[in-house]
Amino acid sequence: MRKFTAFACGTGAGLAAYYLQKLRDPQLAVHNSWTNSDRPISECALWDSNWDFRDPKSLVRPQKNDLPQEQNRYNSDLEKHVAKSARHIILIRHGEYLDVGDSDDTHHLTDRGRLQAKYTGQRLRELGIKWDKVIASNMVRAQETADIILNQIDYDKAKLKHCSYLREGAPIPPQPPVGHWKPEASQFFRDGARIEAAFRRYFHRALPEQEKESYTLIVGHGNVIRYFVCRALQFPAEAWLRISINHASITWLTISPSGNVSIKYLGDTGFMPAKYLTHRIPRDAKNVV
């Protein structure tokens, strides 16, 4: 009888331990939603606060010891590198254009594309923003879009900056891949480095000496803007082709002094009449993407 009791107790304890272990198995745990998990679901969910390499702690010499003078030195150096204001980066995709000819010089906006750009300029004017910088890709369709927008907003055309880094291209092989658009590996190699360089040039927290919020307007291209959005929000960059943005749409990203990034608008064209909404090259043009 004692042997049977001991056997029963041992078996019961073993089953209880097994059951408790199974309950702890994260693959079997059930939450009301993913947000109830006490751990990030994927590594991509972890935010890199030093993504722009401007986190103050990464810019000063580490504290050597706990002596008061060393603490004062460290805190003083840290304070000199702390950003005080937010940066707003507003990205505009060019208007609809015709892909006619083999040269960028022939890729002009359509009449509808010009109207799209005008509506966008009017919308930006209504927002009442005081622009600190306006930058445009040096491709014809972006230059024409920027020129039309500048006719609508309060900004000196002579101050417009032209940037070859913002030219359209193939930033990174997309996931999932698509059958209708397959650039050569050499194009990703070439364009990817340039577009990433553009991201690093324009996306970073404010300098410590910037005392008030700044507004930068960038007129560019669909692929580049979508890549910028993924990089800025620390989404997988390969996801850029999952996003669709209309011609002359507004995308608004804000970089806070802490380095956190938020998105206010993504491809906004709600201010345009529906008949002017487009996102592809017209059907009568070649090389439709």
From Swiss-Prot:
Transmembrane segments: 7-23
Places the protein is found: Mitochondrion outer membrane
Family annotation (CDD domains): HP_PGM_like (cd07067)
Catalytic activity: O-phospho-L-seryl-[protein] + H2O = L-seryl-[protein] + phosphate; O-phospho-L-threonyl-[protein] + H2O = L-threonyl-[protein] + phosphate
GO cellular component: mitochondrial outer membrane
Biological processes annotated in GO: positive regulation of mitochondrial fission; positive regulation of mitochondrial fusion; protein dephosphorylation; response to anesthetic; response to heat
Membrane topology qualifier: Single-pass membrane protein
Keyword Acyltransferase applies: no
Family of the protein in this entry: Belongs to the phosphoglycerate mutase family. BPG-dependent PGAM subfamily.
Function noted in UniProt: Displays phosphatase activity for serine/threonine residues, and dephosphorylates and activates Pk92B kinase. Has apparently no phosphoglycerate mutase activity.
The protein's name in its UniProt record: Serine/threonine-protein phosphatase Pgam5, mitochondrial
